[in-house]
C-alpha cells in the first residue's frame, strides 16, 4: 500500500497542500521577496492581454451609469437598509477608503486597481460594512460589465453620492484598471494584530519610535486603519493630540492643512457612524467569515444586526441636522456648541454638546419620531483644538463658497492622486483646469525629429566628449524616478534639470550639471539648424543620449544594435513642479547605481526589489539591468563596486561570468557593506562588491537568472534583454505610447 492510499485508509487528507504548512517566506523571512515583481500577470487576469479598458470605457454611456447610481442612492434594501433612506454617506465612505490608502512615500495604495475588493483591505477594521456597499453596487457593475472597472465605479459612486445630496463636485476621470489579486508589494506595517496600540508594551512591532515618529512609508496610525483613530491616539480622547496624528497622516497622503480641514469637514457633513451595541456582537471579517456568507463579513448578532442595530466603528455619531444634504451645519455645530466627552452605546469615546444643547435638532436614521443632539468625534474636535486647523475651519465657516470649492478640489485630489498625469484621464467629466499635483508637462507644440535627425544627433552626442558612463547614468537618473504605483516620475518633463531632483546626492549634482550643459548646447545648436519649427526637447535628448551610449558600448562588445527611441517628451518648468511633492521620489537607496547608505546595507536587497517593483520590472529585467549598468560604469560616484570587468564601458556579460566564477572567494571588507573578491589561489583582491551585487550569486532564484546571462552563449541574449529592459524604463511614463 502506498503512502497516499494509506492516508485515505486512515481518513487523512492525502493532499498535503490542502493543509497549512510553512512557506519559504516563513522559513527565511530575511530573503528579498521576488514575488512582488510578478504580480498581476496575464495568468491572473481573466480579461486577457488584448483587453483595452480605455477603449471600453470610452464606449460607456456614462450618463446612464450616473442615472442608475442616483436611483440606487434611495433604493433601500432590507438586508442593509439605507441610513436616512439614502446610501450617500455609505458610498462616500467607500470611495474615500478606496482612495485614502494612498501614501506619497512610495505611491502605493489608492483607488487604482480596486484593491478594496481584496485582502487585507477588504477585512480591515476601518472598512467594516464596506463589503455591503460593494455588494449594493454589484447589479450596476453587472449591468455595465467590462465597460467600467470596479476601481472606477467605486470612485464614480462617491461622486454621484455627493451630487445626489446637493454638492457640486470638481470632476471625475476614468481610467483605473482593475487588478485581480491582492497587492503584495504594499507594506502596511509589522504589527501582528489589528489595531495594535503604539503604547502597548506587548506590541513588539510598533510603527512609532521616539517622539511619536511614524515609520515610513506608512500613513496610518494603527494596523487596519485608513488614517487616524477617531477616538484619538490609541483611543485617548485628546483632540490636540489627535490633530498631530491627523496632520502627519494626511500630509503623507499629500494633503496640506487646508485640504485636510476641507476633507474632514466636507465628508462629515453627510451620514453617520454606527455603534449600536458592543463590538463582541460582531462576527469575523470577510476573509475569515464562513463560506455561506459569500464574502460578506462582520455579521452582527446585536438585534437585527442592520439598520438601527448596525455596528461598524462602534461610534454612534450624527454630525449635522441635514445628513443627506450639503450644508455648512458641520462647521456651525463644531463652533456653535461647547462639547463634553461621552460614550457611544458600544462604549467608544465621542462628544456631545454641553448642558443638553442641540437636543432634538438632528434626525434619527430610521425612526422619524426620534430626534437627537448632534455629536462629534475626537478627530472632529481636533479641527477646533489645533490653532492652525481652527483658523482654517473658521474661515470656511464664514465663507461657505470657499469651503465648498476647497472640499470639491480636495475630494478630486483624494480620489485621483494615484492616477498620475492627465494623459491617463478618461471621460467627459475631466476638469479642464491643470493642477500642480498632476505633475503637468507642456503639450507637444512642434514637429518631432525624424529618423535622419536622430542619426545626426547621435553623432553629435558621441563626439561631444561625454563618456558612456556619464550619458547612461544621466538617462537612468532622469527616467528611473518613475513609480508604477502612482504613475509619477519618469523622464518626461526633464525634471532632472529642476529642483529637487537636480540636487539629489544620488544624481551627483556637479557631474549632472556638466552633462546637462553639454546636452543643452547640442540641443540649442540642433534646434537652431532645423526648419519648419521642428525641435527636440531636452527630455528627449537625455534619453536619446543614453541610448546612443548603449549602442556604442554594444558595438565595442562586437554587437550591432539599435536602442528604440520615441520622441514626444517635453520640458516642464520649475513653476510646474511642486518641490515638496517631488521630494518623496528621491530613493533612500538605489541599488541599480550601487548607491546604498551604510545604515541601509543590511536591507539593500529588499530596497532593490522594492525599487524594481515600482519600476514595474520583472526579476529577469532587474537582473539584466544590474549586470549591464555595472559594466557600463553607471555607479554613483564612479564606484568600482560590482564592476566585474576589465573593460568598463563595454556592454558585456562580464558581471555575470565573473560573479559566478568559483575561482573567487568573497569576504567582508573593512568598509561596512562592502565585500572583497579574492583569487582563491593567489589571495589577491580581484573585485569589490556590495550586498546588492552579491545578492545575484547568493539568492537562489537570482543566481538562476544570473546563470542564464553568465553562460558562454549568452552575450547576444544579454544585450538584447538589456536593451529591452532599458527601453521599458526609459518609456515607463510615456502613456501616449500605450
UniProtKB/Swiss-Prot annotation:
Homodimer or homotetramer. It comes from Beijerinckia indica subsp. indica (strain ATCC 9039 / DSM 1715 / NCIMB 8712). GO terms for biological process: cellular response to hydrogen peroxide; hydrogen peroxide catabolic process. Its EC number is 1.11.1.21. This is Catalase-peroxidase. InterPro entries: Catalase_peroxidase, Haem_peroxidase, Haem_peroxidase_sf, Peroxidases_AS, Peroxidases_heam-ligand_BS. One of its GO terms (molecular function) is metal ion binding. The gene is katG. Residues 352-371 are annotated as: Disordered.
Amino acid at each position: 500500500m502506498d503512502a497516499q492510499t494509506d492516508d485515505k485508509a486512515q481518513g487523512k487528507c492525502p493532499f498535503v497542500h490542502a493543509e497549512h504548512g510553512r512557506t519559504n517566506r516563513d522559513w527565511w523571512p530575511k530573503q528579498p521577496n521576488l514575488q512582488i515583481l510578478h504580480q498581476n500577470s496575464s495568468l491572473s487576469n481573466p480579461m486577457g492581454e488584448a483587453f483595452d479598458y480605455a477603449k471600453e470605457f470610452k464606449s460607456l454611456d456614462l450618463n446612464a451609469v450616473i442615472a442608475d447610481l442616483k436611483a440606487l442612492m434611495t433604493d433601500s434594501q432590507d438586508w442593509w437598509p439605507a441610513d436616512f433612506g439614502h446610501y450617500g454617506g455609505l458610498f462616500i465612505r467607500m470611495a474615500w477608503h478606496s482612495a485614502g490608502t494612498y501614501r506619497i512615500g512610495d505611491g502605493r495604495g489608492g483607488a487604482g486597481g480596486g484593491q478594496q475588493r481584496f485582502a487585507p483591505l477588504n477585512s480591515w477594521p476601518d472598512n467594516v460594512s464596506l463589503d455591503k456597499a460593494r455588494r449594493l453596487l454589484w447589479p450596476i457593475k453587472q449591468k455595465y460589465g467590462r465597460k467600467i472597472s470596479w476601481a472606477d465605479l467605486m470612485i464614480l459612486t462617491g461622486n454621484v453620492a455627493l451630487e445626489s445630496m446637493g454638492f457640486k463636485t470638481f470632476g471625475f476621470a476614468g481610467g483605473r484598471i482593475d487588478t485581480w489579486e491582492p497587492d503584495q508589494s504594499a507594506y502596511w506595517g509589522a504589527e501582528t494584530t489589528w489595531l495594535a496600540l503604539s503604547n502597548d508594551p506587548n506590541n513588539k512591532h510598533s510603527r512609532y519610535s521616539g517622539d511619536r515618529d511614524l515609520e515610513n512609508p506608512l500613513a496610518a496610525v494603527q494596523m487596519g486603519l485608513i488614517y487616524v483613530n477617531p477616538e484619538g491616539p490609541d483611543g485617548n480622547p485628546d483632540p490636540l493630540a489627535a490633530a498631530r496624528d491627523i496632520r502627519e497622516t494626511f500630509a503623507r497622503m499629500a494633503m496640506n492643512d487646508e485640504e485636510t480641514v476641507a476633507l474632514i469637514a466636507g465628508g462629515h457633513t453627510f451620514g453617520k457612524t454606527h455603534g449600536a451595541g458592543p463590538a463582541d456582537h460582531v462576527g469575523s471579517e470577510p476573509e475569515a467569515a464562513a463560506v455561506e456568507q459569500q464574502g460578506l463579513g462582520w455579521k452582527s448578532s446585536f438585534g437585527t444586526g442592520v439598520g438601527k442595530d448596525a455596528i461598524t466603528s462602534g461610534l454612534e455619531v450624527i454630525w449635522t441636522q441635514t445628513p443627506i444634504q450639503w450644508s455648512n451645519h458641520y462647521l456651525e455645530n463644531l463652533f456653535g456648541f461647547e462639547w463634553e466627552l461621552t460614550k457611544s452605546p458600544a462604549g467608544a469615546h465621542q462628544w456631545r454638546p454641553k448642558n443638553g444643547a442641540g437636543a432634538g435638532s438632528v434626525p434619527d436614521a430610521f425612526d422619524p419620531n426620534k430626534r437627537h443632539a448632534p455629536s462629534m468625534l475626537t478627530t472632529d474636535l481636533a479641527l477646533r483644538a489645533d490653532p492652525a486647523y481652527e483658523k482654517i475651519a473658521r474661515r470656511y465657516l464664514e465663507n461657505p463658497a470657499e469651503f465648498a470649492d476647497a472640499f470639491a478640489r480636495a475630494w478630486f485630489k483624494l480620489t485621483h492622486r494615484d492616477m498620475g498625469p492627465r494623459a491617463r484621464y478618461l471621460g467627459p467629466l475631466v476638469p479642464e483646469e491643470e493642477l500642480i499635483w498632476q505633475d503637468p508637462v507642456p503639450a507637444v507644440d512642434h514637429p518631432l525629429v525624424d529618423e535622419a535627425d536622430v542619426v545626426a544627433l547621435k553623432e553629435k552626442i558621441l563626439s561631444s566628449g561625454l563618456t558612456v558612463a556619464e550619458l547612461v547614468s544621466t538617462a537612468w537618473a532622469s527616467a528611473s524616478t518613475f513609480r508604477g504605483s502612482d504613475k509619477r516620475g519618469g523622464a518626461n518633463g526633464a525634471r532632472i534639470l529642476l529642483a529637487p531632483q537636480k540636487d539629489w546626492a544620488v544624481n551627483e549634482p556637479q557631474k549632472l550639471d556638466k552633462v546637462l550643459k553639454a546636452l543643452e548646447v547640442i540641443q540649442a545648436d540642433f534646434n537652431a539648424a532645423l526648419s519648419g519649427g521642428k525641435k527636440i526637447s531636452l527630455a528627449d535628448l537625455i534619453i536619446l543620449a543614453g541610448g546612443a551610449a548603449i549602442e556604442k558600448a554594444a558595438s565595442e562588445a562586437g554587437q550591432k544594435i539599435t536602442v528604440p527611441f520615441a520622441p514626444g517628451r517635453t520640458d516642464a518648468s520649475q513653476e510646474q513642479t511642486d518641490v515638496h511633492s517631488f521630494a518623496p521620489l528621491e530613493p533612500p537607496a538605489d541599488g541599480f547605481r550601487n548607491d546604498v547608505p551604510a545604515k541601509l546595507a543590511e536591507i539593500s536587497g529588499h530596497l532593490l526589489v522594492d525599487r524594481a517593483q515600482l519600476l514595474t520590472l520583472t526579476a529577469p529585467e532587474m537582473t539584466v539591468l544590474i549586470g549591464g549598468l555595472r559594466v557600463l560604469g553607471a555607479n554613483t560616484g564612479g564606484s568600482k563596486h560590482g564592476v566585474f570587468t576589465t573593460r568598463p564601458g563595454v556592454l558585456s556579460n562580464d558581471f555575470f561570468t565573473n560573479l559566478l566564477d568559483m575561482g573567487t572567494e568573497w569576504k567582508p571588507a573593512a568598509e561596512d557593506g562592502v565585500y572583497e573578491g579574492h583569487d582563491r589561489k593567489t589571495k589577491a583582491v580581484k573585485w569589490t562588491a556590495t550586498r546588492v551585487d552579491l545578492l545575484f550569486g547568493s539568492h537562489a532564484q537570482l543566481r538562476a537568472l544570473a546563470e542564464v546571462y553568465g553562460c558562454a552563449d549568452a552575450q547576444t541574449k544579454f544585450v538584447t534583454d538589456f536593451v529591452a529592459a532599458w527601453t521599458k524604463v526609459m518609456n515607463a511614463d510615456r502613456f501616449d505610447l500605450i
